[in-house]
Amino acid sequence: MCVYYEHKIYDDRLSFLKRLRLRKPISWFYAVKIFIDNYRLAQKANSDTVLVYDMVDIHHLRYHRAIQLEPKRFSNKKNFYKFLYLEKKASQKADLVVTVSEDEEKYMQKFANENKLLTISNIHYPKKTIEEVPSFYERENILFVGSIHPPNIDAVEFLINEIMPIVWAKNNSIGVNIVGNVNEVMKEIVHPNVKFLGYVPDMEEFLLKSKIMVAPLRYGAGVKGKIGQAFEYFLPVVTTPIGAEGMKLENHKNAIIAENKEDFAEAILNLYSNEDLWKTLQNNSEDSLFPLSKENLENKIDLIEKNLL
C-alpha cells in the first residue's frame, strides 16, 4: 500500500502511478464521484489494473426516497437523475462493484452483472462485554446520533416534532440526547427535554448511560453506522425499516422496527419500561454484529484476491 500526496508543481497522479510499475494492481475507488473522475487515469497508468467501485451507499436510491417524502423539492429530483446516471455508468465500467449490504447488492443487479457484485459491509465488533455495561435500571433517556446529513436532519425533526410529543404525553420524564454536528443546522428546536450536544469525540459515556438508541430514519440508503455502534455497547435500538435495512434485523429480536410515528412512540414507551424486552434485545446485540465482523471482511478480501488477481 502507498499514499500519494499531489503537488502539481513537481508531480501528478499519472506520473506517480506509472513510476510504481505495478503488476495488475487493484484500483479501489471510494464513492461514485471518485470512480468517475479517476478510473481512466488508473487504466492509462496500468492497462491491466482491476477497477473496484466501492459504492458506500446507493446515492440515487437515497434521493428517490427523498422524493417520496418531498415530491416538490427540485434538488432531490435533480440529484436522483444525476446519481442514477453516474452510478449506472460506474457499475458498468468497474470490474467489481462493492455494495454495503446484500439488499443493495440485489438492487444493483438491475445495472450490473451479479457475478461482479460483492457485499462488504461496515465493520463493528463488541467494545464491551455484556457484563461490563450498566443494567436496565442504571440507565435513562434516549440517544440519537447524527451528522449534518439530510436524512439525519429529517429524522431529528420527525423525532422531536412528531414522535416525542406522543411519548411525552404519557411519560414526560424521558429526555432526548442528540449527539453530532446536526445541532449546527437545528437551532430552532428548543425543548427542556432535548439536549443538542454537538460533536462528541468519545461517545462511550452516552452509549453506556442511555436506555435506548433511536434511529427514526424516513429515507436514506446503505447500512446505518449508528445502529452498529449501539450494538457494540449492547444498547437496544428502536428504528424504522429504512434504518434497519441491510443488517438482517428481526423485529423484537435484534431491534424494534416501527413503521410510523405512533408505532415508534409506542415502541419507545414499551421498551423504556419493559426490562424483559430490553434484555432480549440486549442479549441479541452481539449476534446482530456478525454480518459486520472483521472476520467476515477478511473472508471477502480473500475472495477478491482469488477472483480478480
Regions found by a protein language model. Give the residues of each.
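Acceptor-binding helix/loop patch of EC 2.4 sugar-transfer enzymes
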Residues: 20, 46-82, 106, 137-138
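Conserved catalytic-core segment of nucleotide-activated headgroup transferases in glycan assembly
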Residues: 72, 92, 96-98, 102, ...
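Acidic donor-binding loop of glycosyltransferase active sites
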Residues: 95, 208-222, 233-235
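Short hydrophobic beta-strand element within catalytic cores of glycosyltransferases
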Residues: 226-230, 236-240
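Short acidic/histidine- and often glycine-rich active-site loop of Leloir-type glycosyltransferases
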Residues: 241-252, 256-257
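Conserved acidic donor-binding segment of nucleotide-sugar-dependent glycosyltransferases
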Residues: 255-262, 270-275
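A short, well-ordered alpha-helix in the C-terminal region of glycosyltransferases
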Residues: 277-291, 303
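C-terminal alpha-helical cap of glycosyltransferases
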Residues: 294-309
